[in-house]
């Protein structure tokens, strides 16, 4: 899949592990992902969470007839980050015929939990 000219490229998001059981994505905390006070922007964390869930869901669908799209996402931001890299670990908690739900935990470089998210994806026909 070509990531050129996408939000992933703009934010520096990389998928580092992607299986049916979990997807791990990383993102730098830099000028692209911080808010004006220098802290990681909550929206960037949500983009990372949805990216990890959406990428993971690709392992669970039939690509010839189905696609996954975001239906709902929420996030609780628990700790702030000013530098380094953050890592999202997305694991499916419900794999249904029309929806897939992921829990996503985002950690800083010291493995401190900084964000908890839940993302519901709709499984649609192509």
From Swiss-Prot:
Q: Which GO terms label this protein's molecular function in UniProt?
A: 1,4-dihydroxy-2-naphthoyl-CoA thioesterase activity
Question: Quick check: keyword Hydrolase in the entry?
Answer: yes
Keywords carried by this UniProt record: Hydrolase
Which chain positions lie within coiled-coil regions? none
Q: Write down a Pfam family by its short name.
A: 4HBT
UniProt-listed Enzyme Commission number(s): 3.1.2.-
What SUPFAM superfamilies does the record tag this protein with? Thioesterase/thiol ester dehydrase-isomerase
**What InterPro entries does the annotation carry?**
HotDog_dom_sf, PAAI_dom, Thioestr_dom
What does UniProt give as GO cellular component?
Answer: cytosol
Q: Which family does it belong to?
A: Belongs to the thioesterase PaaI family.
The job of this chain, per UniProt, is described as: Is not required for competence.
Protein name per UniProt? Putative esterase ComA2
Organism expressing this protein natively: Bacillus subtilis (strain 168)
């Amino acid at each position: 899949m070509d990531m050129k000219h996408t939000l992933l490229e703009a934010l520096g998001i990389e998928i580092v592990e992607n299986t049916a059981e979990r997807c791990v994505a990383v993102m730098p905390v830099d000028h692209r992902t911080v808010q004006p006070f220098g802290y990681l922007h909550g929206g960037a964390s949500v983009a990372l969470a949805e990216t990890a869930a959406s990428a993971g869901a690709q392992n669970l669908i039939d690509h010839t007839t189905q696609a996954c799209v975001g239906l709902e996402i929420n996030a609780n931001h628990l700790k702030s980050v000013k530098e380094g890299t953050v890592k999202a670990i997305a694991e499916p908690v419900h794999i249904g015929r029309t929806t897939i739900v992921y829990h996503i935990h985002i950690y800083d470089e010291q493995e401190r939990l900084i964000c908890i998210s839940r993302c519901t994806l709709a499984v649609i026909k192509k």
